[in-house]
């Protein structure tokens, strides 16, 4: 394995020998199953679900992460690229609407090779479900292989990105990444049943005390890609955990006023997409890391 430069950390570590900035070495996953917690156009509402593969490791260091065991601690099971391809085809056989690759950035080169080899047998869309901290050069490896990009756009403020994710360059990196994603997929396309066929769906988790930054995120997004060409998902599922409990703003849940301020602003800007109910702010969106399907 060459020195790793897949993510913006550019750690240049030989991940065949030691862990990189992403906290993992080889290809590791923690679960592969039909998943029903994504947006309706991804998971569906007919009981089929998204064919979700949760990868271990992450290039971001978000202090409020609810998936810490796999994102930071590297919990997971090592598999071969060949097995990854088999898992994708098995999920298709189970009736998945799509293949949903969660936190795939640090395996992008492997994923590109796997998708190239199985694409003739894979007849459902492939979703690249990521944190938005992506290098354009890495995304270009996937051009023509990914049907749906599902990135986060977490922050507009470099200061917030530094404090909460140890990534002050996050805003500038995410903007370029989302522009590249849109270049690859073009305007959102849907199947007759409303499921997403192609395009970009941008997620934003509204954080307590950060509603003005959330509005700035929407401003930047509108200036980056056509509002009518994408979908957005404004999430209110923030639940304090881990080190976030030690930070004043992050030690509480989001208020209805804060969330509605952001959703109202998104509507003013003309965005189309998804919102969440207050009851979503629980840990029930966090799966059990039981190696199912691996």
Question: Can you name each region flagged by the protein language model?
Answer:
Residues 71, 108, 132-135, 153-171, ...:
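Conserved radical SAM core fold
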Residues 23-144, 148, 157-159:
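Conserved Radical SAM active-site core
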Residues 162-193:
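Anionic-ligand binding region
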Residues 1-19, 186-294:
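Auxiliary Fe-S-binding modules of radical SAM enzymes
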Residues 143-158, 230-238:
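Non-cysteine beta-strand/loop elements that form the S-adenosyl-L-methionine
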Residues 51, 99, 126-128, 149-151, ...:
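Hydrophobic faces of well-ordered beta-strands that scaffold small-molecule active sites
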Residues 114-125, 176-184, 256-264:
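Alpha-helix-loop-beta-strand connector modules within alpha/beta enzyme cores
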Residues 79, 106, 165-173, 209, ...:
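Alpha-helix N-cap and loop-to-helix initiation/capping positions
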């Amino acid at each position: 394995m060459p020195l790793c430069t897949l993510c913006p950390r550019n750690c240049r570590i030989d991940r065949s020998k030691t862990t990189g900035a992403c906290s993992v070495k080889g290809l590791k996953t923690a679960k592969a199953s039909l998943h029903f917690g994504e947006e309706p156009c991804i998971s569906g509402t007919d009981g089929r679900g998204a064919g979700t593969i949760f990868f271990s490791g992450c290039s971001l260091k978000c202090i409020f992460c609810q998936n810490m065991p796999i994102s930071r601690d590297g919990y997971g099971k090592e598999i071969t690229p060949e097995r990854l391809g088999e898992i994708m085809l098995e999920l298709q056989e189970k009736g998945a609407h799509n293949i949903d690759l969660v936190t795939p950035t640090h395996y992008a080169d492997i994923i590109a090779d796997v998708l190239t080899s199985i694409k003739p047998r894979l007849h459902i869309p492939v979703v690249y479900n990521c944190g938005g901290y992506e290098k354009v050069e890495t995304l270009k490896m996937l051009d023509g292989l990914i049907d749906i990009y599902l990135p986060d756009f977490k922050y507009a403020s470099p200061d917030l990105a530094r404090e909460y994710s140890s990534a002050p360059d996050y805003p500038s990196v995410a903007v370029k990444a989302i522009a590249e994603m849109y270049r690859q997929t073009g305007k959102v396309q849907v199947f007759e049943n409303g499921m997403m066929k192609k395009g970009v769906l941008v997620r934003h988790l509204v954080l307590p005390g950060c509603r003005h930054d959330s509005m700035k995120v929407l401003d930047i997004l509108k200036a980056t890609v056509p509002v009518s060409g994408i979908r957005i998902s404004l999430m209110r599922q923030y639940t304090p955990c881990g080190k976030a409990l030690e930070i004043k703003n992050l030690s509480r849940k989001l208020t209805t006023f804060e969330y509605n301020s952001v959703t109202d602003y998104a509507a003013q800007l003309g965005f189309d997409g998804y919102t969440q109910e207050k009851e979503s702010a629980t840990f029930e969106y966090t799966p059990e890391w039981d190696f199912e399907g691996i």
